[in-house]
Amino acid sequence: MRGYHYQEDLRSLRPYIREYKPVLVGVDGGADAILEQGYTPDMIIGDMDSVSDQALRCGAEIVVHAYRNGKAPGTERLKREGIPHVVFPATGTSEDVAMLLADDKDAEMIVALGTHASLVEFLDKGRSGMASTFLTRLRVESKLVDAKGVSQLYQPRVSTWQTLLSP
């Protein structure tokens, strides 16, 4: 997702990403945000309406979020371009699907970047479908950390050679 301040939040996570090498999941246009910062997404989840061709061809696993009835308009584009993908029918938003998949794969921590985390952002979205987001947050709440929190709490490790070279 490309929520408020996503670029500066992603930049602030550089040391964390360098040290922990987390699985990077781009939700829709969030895949392009990951690429803009010099990283490659491991997985892209969404309806694929706002994902660039570059992102779709970066080697990430592509999961098309389909409607409950299985219809996924984004698959036409992927089929036409010959891009391998998986269709995942689910209610809720693509962001919800990403968090639930991470939870299902036993992620120890889900660092949310560019999501609609505050009450203002949540309400600003203005969709009735946001109820699923509330339920998803209840499900993953013990694992979910906002990127701003990680960047403020994370302290990079100092390696031995850095200590030896210090004046």
Sequence positions of predicted segments:
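C-terminal functional extensions of proteins
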Residues: 98-101, 109, 113-167
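Short beta-strand scaffold positions
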Residues: 25-26, 46
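Acidic/Gly/His-enriched mid-domain segments of enzyme catalytic cores or analogous surface patches
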Residues: 33-111, 115
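Short acidic, glycine/serine/threonine-rich loops at helix termini
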Residues: 9-12, 36-39, 55-57, 122-125
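Short, electropositive, low-hydrophobicity segments enriched in small/polar residues
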Residues: 7, 50, 118
